[in-house]
């Protein structure tokens, strides 16, 4: 907490646990992926706030779902899919009844895999990241004249490209000091 701008009044533990706050017991579930220190919180009335671990049904058409690290996000969604709570509250819109939650987890995974496969299909030959980004933005009609917004799109595309490299769908090479990405031949099943 030495590097923080403000001193926190309560430090939330960095592991899965029960945590008392103002005399009330909450469950803490570590779910990195969307961000490195992302957590879910379970209230005493058995409601789980999943925050950005998942997209709600209302957001299943997201063009470029954000995750800092897609492999960690998949693991966190699987972990949450094994939990059983009466309801789940999802950031940016949505409450999911507990009985429907496992299907929502599967649908979130399917959306990310679908987007990754679509992005992979846009790389047929060794291609620079800038060109991949341009193709993805054109494909999803993410057209803007605002640099800050285009940087957000670029960030989201980069995390998908990193996922494709990490999982062996794309390989990197260098040419004249520029990193190029090419398909390895591995396909989504």
PLM features: what roles do these ranges have?
Residues 20, 40-42, 182:
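Short, well-ordered beta-strand micro-motif
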Residues 22, 44, 175-177:
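Structural motif
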């Amino acid at each position: 907490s030495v590097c923080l701008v403000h001193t926190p009044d309560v430090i939330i533990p960095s592991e899965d646990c029960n945590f008392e706050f103002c005399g009330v017991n909450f469950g803490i579930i570590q779910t990195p992926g969307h961000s490195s220190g992302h957590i879910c919180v379970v209230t005493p009335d058995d409601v789980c706030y999943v925050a950005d671990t998942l997209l709600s049904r209302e957001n299943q058409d997201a063009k470029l779902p954000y995750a800092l690290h897609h492999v960690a996000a998949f693991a966190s969604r699987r972990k949450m899919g094994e939990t059983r709570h009466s309801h789940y509250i999802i950031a940016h819109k949505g409450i999911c009844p507990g009985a429907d939650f496992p299907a929502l987890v599967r649908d979130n995974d399917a959306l990310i895999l679908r987007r990754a496969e679509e992005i992979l299909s846009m790389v047929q030959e060794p291609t620079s990241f800038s060109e991949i980004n341009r193709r993805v933005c054109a494909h999803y009609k993410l057209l803007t004249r605002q640099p800050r917004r285009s940087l957000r799109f670029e960030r989201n595309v980069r995390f998908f490209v990193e996922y494709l490299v990490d999982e062996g769908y794309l390989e990197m090479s260098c040419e004249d000091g520029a990193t190029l990405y090419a398909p390895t031949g591995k396909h989504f099943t």
